[in-house]
């Protein structure tokens, strides 16, 4: 059984009070790329988490970037994950992991090895569909948003599709699995802005920066289902 890191201490999930109900508790999360045992954009992930913690719960955290980086490297080693490339999930529990807890706690899990050693652009024509489902505190990486994205994915797969773009009650496409959805028309790339409910992420910042470096005009505008029918390409990013 893989170990996890709870508040800096390495433990087996079976030793936690109730590992399944724990993940149903309110929490914030980040999926983190690691290359060679390190997380190159860890500061961005921690910035997003601390901002969400402050805005949603009015709380501050003293998460140390150097300590979290050390715990990630050690956890990958303990669980014998390949150093080349892996995905790690960092969860922040503002109300604690157990019912009786009264402090903010964090959990680090090794998720899965990744196929590629670095970021890779690849082209695969996957079937995309949309699902209308609003999450509480839209625009933040919450457990509620995670459940809504999973619901959308299962719904689309039952329809025979592969990717689910989640749509809010106003008909705005928020993203795919918590990551940005972009549509490309000519030399223009459009994506839903954070102010319209899209979620900030390290991958979002990277892909928008890459588009600008390639000379594309990046426009943040609320995407709709109808816009998918008129674009040249639709693309998203994933920790894989």
Annotated model-derived regions:
Residues 81-92:
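Ordered, amphipathic secondary-structure segments that act as subunit-interaction surfaces
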Residues 1-74, 95-240:
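Helix-start/capping segments and mature chain N-termini
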């Amino acid at each position: 059984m893989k170990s996890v890191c709870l508040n800096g201490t390495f433990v087996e999930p079976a030793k936690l009070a109730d590992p399944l109900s724990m993940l149903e508790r309110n929490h914030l999360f980040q999926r983190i790329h690691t290359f060679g045992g390190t997380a190159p954009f860890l500061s961005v992930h921690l910035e997003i988490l601390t901002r969400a913690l402050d805005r949603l719960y009015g709380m501050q955290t003293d998460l140390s970037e150097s300590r979290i980086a050390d715990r990630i490297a050690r956890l990958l080693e303990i669980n014998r994950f390949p150093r080349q490339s892996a995905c790690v999930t960092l969860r922040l529990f503002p109300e604690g992991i157990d019912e009786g807890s009264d402090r903010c706690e964090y959990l680090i899990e090794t998720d899965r090895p990744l196929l590629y050693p670095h970021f890779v652009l690849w082209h695969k024509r996957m079937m995309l569909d949309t699902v209308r489902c609003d999450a509480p505190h839209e625009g933040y990486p919450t457990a509620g948003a995670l459940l809504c994205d999973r619901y959308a994915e299962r719904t689309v797969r039952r329809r025979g599709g592969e990717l689910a773009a989640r749509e809010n009650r106003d008909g705005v496409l928020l993203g795919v699995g918590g990551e940005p959805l972009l549509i490309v028309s000519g030399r223009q790339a459009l994506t839903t802005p954070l102010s319209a409910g899209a979620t900030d992420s390290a991958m979002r910042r990277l892909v928008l920066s890459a588009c600008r470096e390639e000379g594309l005009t990046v426009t943040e505008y609320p995407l709709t289902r109808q816009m998918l029918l008129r674009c040249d390409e639709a693309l998203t990013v994933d920790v894989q």
